Amino acid sequence: MNLNLTLLGQAISFAIFVWFCMKYVWPPVIAALEERSKKIADGLEAANRASRDLELAQEQASQILRESKENAAEIIEQANKRANQMVDEAKEQVIADGKRLREAAQAEIEQDVMRAKEALRAQVSVLAFAGAEKILGATIDEKAHSEIVEQLAKEL
């Protein structure tokens, strides 16, 4: 047995095996590895993209929530302003009604005073007539005349 020939045969067999593997086995293995690597890279990219999308969605959600809170606060503020305005309008209406009622009552009081004055004038004229009749009917005495006038003044 010749060691050199065996070694040469094994080397040739190995070279054929390597050539066969490089020609037929290696390309599908490399293609599978590249495909797997591409899938992994695509998966990582999709995960990164999803992470960015999630962050964007969270930012948008927080912004929408902030805007909603601001809108709610604005609506509440407007409602409070409107309520205060309505209260002020009601107060003004009550004050105006009070003034109107007070003026009406004052006018009625003035009318009552005028009626009372007219009634008193009528009574004074009646009393003056009665006093004049008593003065003219009685003697023209200075003392009696002053007593009648004092009595009339007391009656008024």
From Swiss-Prot:
GO molecular function, one term: proton-transporting ATP synthase activity, rotational mechanism
Top-level taxon: Bacteria
Entry's family note: Belongs to the ATPase B chain family.
Main location: membrane
Subcellular localization, as worded in the UniProt entry: Cell inner membrane
PANTHER family recorded: ATP SYNTHASE SUBUNIT B, ATP SYNTHASE SUBUNIT B', CHLOROPLASTIC
Cited InterPro entries: ATP_synth_B-like_membr_sf (IPR028987), ATP_synth_b/b'su_bac/chlpt (IPR002146), ATP_synth_F0_bsu_bac (IPR005864), ATP_synthase_B_chain (IPR050059)
Family matches, as SUPFAM superfamilies: F1F0 ATP synthase subunit B, membrane domain
Entry keywords, A to Z: ATP synthesis, Cell inner membrane, Cell membrane, CF(0), Hydrogen ion transport, Ion transport, Membrane, Transmembrane, Transmembrane helix, Transport
Any one GO cellular component localisation term in the record: proton-transporting ATP synthase complex
Subunit structure: F-type ATPases have 2 components, F(1) - the catalytic core - and F(0) - the membrane proton channel. F(1) has five subunits: alpha(3), beta(3), gamma(1), delta(1), epsilon(1). F(0) has three main subunits: a(1), b(2) and c(10-14). The alpha and beta chains form an alternating ring which encloses part of the gamma chain. F(1) is attached to F(0) by a central stalk formed by the gamma and epsilon chains, while a peripheral stalk is formed by the delta and b chains.
NCBIfam families associated with the record: ATP_synt_b, PRK05759.1-2
Topology versus the membrane: Single-pass membrane protein
Transmembrane segments: 7-29
Chain's role: F(1)F(0) ATP synthase produces ATP from ADP in the presence of a proton or sodium gradient. F-type ATPases consist of two structural domains, F(1) containing the extramembraneous catalytic core and F(0) containing the membrane proton channel, linked together by a central stalk and a peripheral stalk. During catalysis, ATP synthesis in the catalytic domain of F(1) is coupled via a rotary mechanism of the central stalk subunits to proton translocation. Component of the F(0) channel, it forms part of the peripheral stalk, linking F(1) to F(0).
Name of the molecule in the record: ATP synthase subunit b 2
